[in-house]
């Protein structure tokens, strides 16, 4: 009985913490003059709490495993909603594909530039011009 209550407590604590970050993000988003989704701000809050080790990762692990395990199921309503606008998507297929391709290219270029900026060029041992 005690083990069952402990497992229930771990899952309950995980979901409460995840939802607390979500609703804090929604609240902060409602105060901002710029439109940023509250779920994104909530994820950033959760990330900061975990990165600074204010919130132990083991407290949110059980809830995260459940959400990741059933993630595909959570996308079904979105897919059904998109299919309601299939005619509109078919009419705008070209611009949608072009915008996806351009945004993918922009993300690729920005990430490669920022990676080069952060990591820099590394000298290889034995490379011409490297000091030994």
From Swiss-Prot:
Its main location: membrane. Disulfide bonds: none annotated. It is a multi-pass membrane protein. It is found in: Cell inner membrane. Keywords: Cell inner membrane, Cell membrane, Membrane, Transmembrane, Transmembrane helix. Pfam families: LrgA. One of its GO terms (cellular component) is plasma membrane. This is UPF0299 membrane protein YohJ.
């Amino acid at each position: 009985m005690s083990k069952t209550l402990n497992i229930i407590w771990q899952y309950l604590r995980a979901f409460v913490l995840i939802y607390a970050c979500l609703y804090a993000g929604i609240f902060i988003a409602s105060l901002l003059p710029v439109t940023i989704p509250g779920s994104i701000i909530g994820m950033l809050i959760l990330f900061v709490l975990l990165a600074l080790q204010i919130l132990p990762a083991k407290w949110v692990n059980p809830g995260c495993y459940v959400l990741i395990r059933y993630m595909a199921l959570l996308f079904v309503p979105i897919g059904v909603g998109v299919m309601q606008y299939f005619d509109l998507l078919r009419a705008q297929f070209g611009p949608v594909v072009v915008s996806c391709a351009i945004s993918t290219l922009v993300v690729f270029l920005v990430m490669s530039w920022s990676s080069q900026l952060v990591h820099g060029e590394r000298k290889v041992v034995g490379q011409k011009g490297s000091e030994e």
